[in-house]
């Protein structure tokens, strides 16, 4: 009986095939990993985590996690959608300093091509700010993020959020309210993908 169970497990393993997991075209279609499946349709909807460092071959950017979701399988390639990003907890802890203020915001925005994204920007001041200054900075962060999203398509906005251009735009304006040490987009989450979103390109 034991031999039959082992044989069935071996036969099931042999029936599975390897699939490469590919990032979207605007992330250079980088191969971010591989997985096995007996039925490729079971891969669709699975989330995969990688880092900006792995996507760009720049290991200094491994503190930024990128979340992808498999949307289709073509041949031995599993294509993906970008579902968001998040800075590692260790990285955030490393930039928190005593006697300073941390200002967080949480805002849902809509891009001009209809994607709804939850964005979580964070500011760190040089010294401790007053509550009125913190509120003014928070309101400015929300205003800038909403404006940039409304003016951008999904790909452009997410690249700006992940690669630092959006945080730089916040820094340039908010520093006049109170001196800032750093601004980060701590996290993004894709809440809604429009029905008219283009289908993934074939490999």
Swiss-Prot record:
* One Gene Ontology term from the biological process aspect of the record: translation
Keyword Ribonucleoprotein found: yes
Cellular component, GO annotation = cytosol; ribonucleoprotein complex; ribosome
The GO terms this record gives for MF are: structural constituent of ribosome
List the coiled-coil residues. none
Keyword terms: Ribonucleoprotein, Ribosomal protein
Source domain of life is Archaea
Family the entry assigns? Belongs to the eukaryotic ribosomal protein eS1 family.
Q: Which PANTHER family match?
A: 40S RIBOSOMAL PROTEIN S3A
Q: What is this protein called?
A: Small ribosomal subunit protein eS1
Q: Which organism is it from?
A: Methanosarcina acetivorans (strain ATCC 35395 / DSM 2834 / JCM 12185 / C2A)
Q: Which gene encodes it?
A: rps3ae
């Amino acid at each position: 009986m034991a031999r039959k169970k082992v044989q069935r497990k071996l036969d099931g393993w042999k029936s599975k095939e390897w699939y490469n997991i590919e990032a979207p075209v605007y992330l250079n279609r980088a191969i971010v990993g591989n997985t096995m499946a007996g039925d490729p349709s079971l891969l669709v909807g699975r989330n995969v985590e990688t880092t900006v460092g792995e996507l760009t071959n720049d290991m200094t950017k491994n503190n930024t996690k990128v979340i992808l979701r498999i949307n289709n399988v073509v041949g031995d390639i599993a294509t993906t959608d970008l579902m968001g990003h998040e800075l590692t907890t260790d990285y955030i802890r490393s930039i928190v300093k005593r006697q300073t203020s941390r200002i967080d915001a949480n805002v849902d925005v809509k891009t001009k091509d209809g994607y709804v994204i939850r964005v979580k920007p964070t500011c760190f001041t040089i010294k401790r700010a007053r509550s009125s200054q913190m509120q003014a900075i928070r309101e400015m962060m929300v205003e800038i993020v909403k404006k940039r999203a409304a003016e951008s398509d999904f790909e452009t906005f997410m690249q700006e959020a992940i690669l630092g251009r959006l945080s730089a735009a916040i820094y340039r304006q908010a520093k006049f309210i109170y001196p800032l040490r750093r601004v980060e987009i701590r996290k993004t989450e894709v809440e809604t993908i429009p029905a008219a979103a283009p289908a993934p390109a074939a490999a």
